[in-house]
Amino acid sequence: LLHSNSITYWDYIHTDALLGLQIQRTNLPDEMVFIAYHQINELIFKMILWEIKQVAEGESLKVDVFQDKLMRISRYFDMLTTSFNIMREGMDVAQYNKFRHTLTPASGFQSAQYRKIEFASTELINLIDIRFRANIDRDTPFEHAFEHLYWQAAGKDHKTGEKSLLLLGFEKKYKDEFLRYMEEYNTINIWQKFKQLPDADQKDRELVNAMRHYDYTVNVTWVMGHLNAARKYIDSGKGSGEATGGSDWKKYMLPKYQKRIFFPELWTKEEIDNWGENL
């Protein structure tokens, strides 16, 4: 209180502005659930990026600080995973299949913050579509690597190279920003910061477990929570079977297809081979 003027809760949180951002495109009541839920996700993504930034920019990080940041991030993803019940049980399927058509080609696929979380977590090679990894390395130009990221499969016909409106709009808005971000975090992503620790710290069992927990939470637990929520609506038999935006959602989302693993060196061959299986 000695360092600030008095302020009200609503001014500090900007409640009026925050609560004025949920703008529906239809008069279907459950669209409000869909909008607010995704906005909450974006706020949590912002908090995750805030923690990652502190790791990336930290000098001479101690094991306990590194571990604390990882567990903070993991708890955010744990919360996001359990919150999928809000989506899965909180919307009427018939309403969803009506208002979803007003969203095209918008999609949660187009969350720029989530892409940044991925770029800031791991080596770029681990985000490349598994079909193209053999021909890409650290010397590959960022733009070429960008064209072969795993999520391009959700919006591109790799036989013709033609991109969907979903992907074209996303790239028009964010591609330049992504390329700068990819380059910035190339040497300060979470994996690089881990490898910069002293050897003894890299072998710290609690830190390794925190790294593994974060990896599995993001790339399997959270993804499957998202997939299971999507299945209820997309595979309900009451709609077209396409995701919002028309993405190839099964190939894009199922962990076993793309083997998205942030820290493969921390997993055994058997664990990697069975990644995303038997869930």
Name the predicted role of every residue range.
Residues 1-279:
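Surface-exposed peri-terminal alpha-helical interaction modules
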